[in-house]
Amino acid sequence: MSDLKVTLHDAQMEIFRSEKRFKVASCGRRFGKSYLAAWVLIIKALQSTSKDVFYIAPTFQQAKDILWGILKEVGQDVIKSAHENTATLTLVNDRKIYLKGSDRPDTLRGVGLSYVVLDEYASMKPEVWEMIIRPTLADVKGEALFIGTPNGKNHFYKLWVDAQDESRDDWEAFQFNSTDNTFLDPLEIEAAKSTMSTQASRQEFEATFESFSGGVFKEEWVKYS
């Protein structure tokens, strides 16, 4: 097996290198969440001596569409086998990476895990973490990464705020703009933002948690050319 060269930009590396057990990352579109998740899962699975790892998206199909190809790309030197139908990778140390959907909660039960990535957690039911996934980490004090773009001030926002509480010394919160991805052309992001309302562009590209109040019009929501 050749040495793995983890290729991530500085903002991704800040999350990757964090030694906190639980990490909550609010990131703008095109930040590079999927490549970060893939590298984290590969490394954590290789480091695990007894338990496997999960990647969970809102739906199973989303999990496959988002990460299956990327995982096979970045992990090609350490993958022993790949099962396409179940979206399961077995690595050279016989640890497995499972792609899952939060829309199939029964497939998330009955296992012990060393690591889990919950991608676009804002679009999942909070019970997926609280009642199903959290207990699976208890055996070996497994870790978790919550990552996604905000969707209003829902349970993802609450978790992100709670992760900043100094009394929770095993949690850490992150917030990164799309332009923190140094592989992106910032002019392209600005061009996209120019077609959106201020509030929407803040949420999608600056990863801020916005309150979209129904029935209340705000002048700042409109862009004028």
For the regions a protein language model found, what residue spans apply to each?
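Pre-P-loop entry segment of helicase/translocase ATPase cores
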Residues: M1-F22
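Conserved P-loop
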Residues: K20-T88, Y157-K158
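Residue-level preference for the first positions of well-ordered beta-strands
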Residues: F22-V24, D52-F54, I97, Y115, ...
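Inter-Walker segment of RecA-like/P-loop motor cores
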Residues: F60-S114, R202, F209
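ASCE P-loop NTPase helicase motor core
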Residues: S123-T195
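ATPase catalytic-site recognition across NTP-hydrolyzing enzymes
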Residues: N181-S225
